[in-house]
From Swiss-Prot:
GTP binds at residues 220-227, 245-249, 267-270, 333-336, 352-354. NCBIfam families: GTP_HflX. This is GTPase HflX. GO terms for cellular component: cytoplasm. GO terms for molecular function: GTP binding; GTPase activity; metal ion binding; ribosome binding. GTPase that associates with the 50S ribosomal subunit and may have a role during protein synthesis or ribosome biogenesis. The lineage of its organism: Bacteria, Bacillati, Bacillota, Clostridia, Thermoanaerobacterales. Pfam families: GTP-bdg_M, GTP-bdg_N, MMR_HSR1. It comes from Caldanaerobacter subterraneus subsp. tengcongensis (strain DSM 15242 / JCM 11007 / NBRC 100824 / MB4). Residues 214-374 form the Hflx-type G domain. PANTHER family: GTP-BINDING PROTEIN 6-RELATED, GTP-BINDING PROTEIN HFLX. It is found in: Cytoplasm. Belongs to the TRAFAC class OBG-HflX-like GTPase superfamily. HflX GTPase family. Monomer. Associates with the 50S ribosomal subunit.
Length: 428
């Protein structure tokens, strides 16, 4: 991210470049409580998110404190500073770096006289802007409705102008009346539609499993270069833009490996710090494609100054999805911007997806990981060990199975890794 210089005016950060801005962009002031170094990084991301949503960031106000004011998010003195700044700079909205309650939103709007958008609403707004598929649009709407339901009081003013500006994209007035029963009914209807789409996805997954076509899922922090890698490997035309969450709807393409074997390569939505819980829940069926993948390619922006922290964020999301134990190759991207490139190993591959550097080595690593030497092994699973049995069904190639009073007897073709993990269930 390009570093932007700011000047200090009574502890307010204002962009150097203050020429008259085009009025088609909303003028935004960012507000954040800083209690740790990580908060500084999330504030940098908030600026990127605001720009991605279409705002022009004209200033940033921060307050160093441990707790959040229950009424206004920031303290009384800072609120007065912010009010003066909003008036002087003719700001259109204030974007807050945390999730607010309905009461906090209402109190801030009453005090400042401008629209208030919190971090969660901003991310949901970007997702609404990016969604293209039927499923993607339904998932975003579901997340927005669940976010707005407990905030009807605070968002009352915003609901009257839905569809016009940041934080107001998505369901319009006809869909989103200020009526909890109506919203709950809409949530139920969307969830039923998504269940039907999930059944279709499961059928596709079972068909791929039956045809023994491995699935490789590309995961990573947002804007790490996942779609660029998909395009470079498959010749696809997935949407690529240097903005956060440029890809929302998952893309799946056929990939031919050096041996001629074919796999399915999927691109997924990027992860980010403070990813809204409602969004994760709404996109659970899409994100679960990661859980059922045979191999993960974790794309990492090697130029990012907080690379290690972003890796931890991705690993946390993978853990929440139940995919932390899925075989993984770390793909360190953007080496064209480095002066010295590490050599790497079988699990750490250094590439430039943009310049197509290192892709041959990556393809070899994918093939080596997916098609390891296998052997036929017999297992016996007691009926209470369904987790281990399902693991074998997902990861191995079942040749035959039998159910009797002892449990489930399975003969399967497995890798050494699977055999070692299930060694307690092996029978001679």
């Amino acid at each position: 991210m390009q570093k932007i210089e700011y000047i200090i005016i009574t502890k307010l950060w204002v962009g150097d470049c203050m020429e008259e801005l085009a009025r088609d962009k909303e003028r935004a002031i960012l507000v954040a409580i800083i209690s740790s170094p990580e908060d500084e990084e999330t504030l940098n991301e908030l600026k990127e998110l605001a720009v991605t949503a279409g705002a022009e960031v004209i200033g940033i106000l921060t307050q160093k404190k441990k707790g959040i004011n229950k009424a206004h998010y920031i303290g009384k003195g800072k609120l007065e500073e912010l009010k003066m700044f909003v008036e002087n700079q003719q700001a259109d909205l204030v974007i807050v770096n945390d999730e607010l309650t309905g009461t906090q939103i209402k109190n801030l709007e009453d005090a400042l006289g401008v629209k208030i958008v919190d971090r969660t609403n901003l991310i949901l707004d970007i997702f609404a802007k990016r969604a293209r598929s039927k499923e993607g649009m339904l998932q975003v709407e579901l997340a927005q409705l669940k976010y707005r339901l407990p905030r009807l009081v605070g968002l009352g003013g915003q609901l009257s102008r839905l569809g016009g500006g940041i934080g107001t994209r998505g369901p319009g007035e006809t869909k989103l009346e200020v009526d909890r029963r109506h919203i709950r009914n809409r949530i139920k209807a969307i969830e039923e539609k998504l269940e039907e789409l999930e059944k279709h996805r499961n059928l596709q997954r079972q068909r791929r499993k039956k045809n023994q076509i491995p699935v490789v899922a590309i995961v990573g922090y947002t804007n790490a270069g996942k779609s660029t890698l998909l395009n470079a490997l498959t010749g696809a035309d997935a949407y690529v833009e240097d903005k956060l969450f440029a890809t929302l709807d998952p893309t799946a393409r056929k990939l031919v490996l050096p041996s001629g074997r074919e796999v399915i390569l999927t691109d997924t939505v990027g992860f980010i710090r403070k990813l809204p819980h409602d969004l994760v829940e709404a996109f659970k069926s899409t994100l679960e494609e990661v859980k059922y993948a045979d191999l993960l390619l974790h794309v990492i922006d090697v130029t990012s100054p907080d690379m290690d922290e972003k890796i931890k964020v991705v690993e946390k999301v993978l853990s929440d999805l139940g995919a932390i134990e899925t075989p993984r190759i770390n793909v360190y991207n953007k080496i064209d911007l480095l002066e010295i490139v590490p050599s790497g190993n079988n699990r750490d591959i250094y590439i430039s997806a943009k310049n197509k550097i290192g892709l041959d080595r990556l393809l070899e690593a994918i093939e080596r990981e997916l098609f390891k030497e296998t052997e036929v092994v017999s297992f016996l699973f007691p009926y209470e060990k369904t987790r281990e049995y399902n693991y074998l069904k997902e990861r191995g190639k079942v040749i035959e199975e039998d159910f009797d009073e002892k449990g489930i007897s399975v003969k399967a073709e497995v890798t050494c890794e699977i055999k070692e993990r299930l060694r307690n269930f092996i029978i001679s």
